[in-house]
């Protein structure tokens, strides 16, 4: 998995139009991910984004419900997001059981903006077959972002751009928010290809991407 250009993206690269949505590995116009796109989630870390990885800090002081187990997918599990106010988990955010035992990390997010799913890349000692239907998983509440961060800004509203943001450290993108186009959904994804209008495609590594996207591979 690699990136060209500073800041986790370069200004070239094809991205679909369309604001507001997530998508996994599945293709389709209006998605952010391998093909690029404006102001959404991206595949991989890069400079100046959220979730560049880092060391394990241990379990948090408290955890909140983030998802329900739906089904296994290869060695990962697919969950329906059940956060309050549809808050969005960071990519690579640790996922726990209720007893704060870490089971893995957020890998991909896909589906409709207000009805979305995510996959968990399990830790080496975990098996997807060991979980039950609708079993709940948990997350550090500090690893959740408000859904409004990924919605297009209303006409005439002033303030910093949504979706991309300036990022942290060097090379943060200036993102243009939700981008042009209609309302959204997540595209593709291993969890079953939830469609919808244009959107962000996102997965491993994390962070928000500004500009027109990035070229990324594995």
From Swiss-Prot:
Cell wall biogenesis/degradation recorded as keyword: no
Q: Where is the composition biased (Gly residues)?
A: 1-56, 161-218
| Xref: Pfam families | Gar1
Q: Name one GO biological process term.
A: pseudouridine synthesis
Which keywords does UniProt give here? Nucleus, Repeat, Ribonucleoprotein, Ribosome biogenesis, RNA-binding, rRNA processing
State the residue spans of region: RGG-box 1.
4-49
Q: Name one GO molecular function term.
A: RNA binding
Role summary: Required for ribosome biogenesis. Part of a complex which catalyzes pseudouridylation of rRNA. This involves the isomerization of uridine such that the ribose is subsequently attached to C5, instead of the normal N1. Pseudouridine ('psi') residues may serve to stabilize the conformation of rRNAs.
What protein name does the entry list? Answer: H/ACA ribonucleoprotein complex subunit 1
Lineage at the top is:
Eukaryota, Metazoa, Chordata, Craniata, Vertebrata
């Amino acid at each position: 998995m690699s990136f060209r250009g500073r800041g986790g993206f370069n200004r070239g690269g094809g991205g679909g139009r369309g604001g507001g949505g997530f998508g996994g590995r599945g293709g389709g116009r209006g998605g952010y991910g391998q093909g690029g796109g404006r102001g959404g989630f991206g595949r991989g870390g890069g400079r100046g984004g959220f979730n560049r990885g880092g060391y394990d800090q241990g379990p948090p002081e408290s955890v909140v419900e983030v998802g329900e187990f739906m089904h296994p997918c290869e060695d990962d599990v697919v969950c329906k997001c059940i956060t309050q106010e549809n808050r969005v988990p960071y990519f690579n955010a640790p996922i726990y059981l209720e007893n704060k035992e870490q089971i893995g990390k957020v890998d991909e997010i896909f589906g409709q903006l207000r009805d979305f799913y995510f996959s968990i890349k399990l830790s080496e000692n975990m098996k997807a077959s060991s979980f039950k239907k609708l079993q709940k998983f948990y997350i550090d509440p500090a690893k959740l972002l408000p859904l409004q961060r990924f919605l297009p800004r209303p006409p005439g509203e002033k303030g910093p751009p949504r979706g991309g943001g300036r990022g942290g450290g060097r090379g943060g993108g200036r993102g243009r928010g939700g981008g042009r186009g209609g309302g959204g959904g997540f595209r593709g994804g291993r969890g079953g290809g939830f469609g919808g209008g244009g959107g962000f495609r996102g997965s491993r590594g994390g962070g928000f991407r500004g500009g027109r996207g990035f070229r990324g591979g594995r």
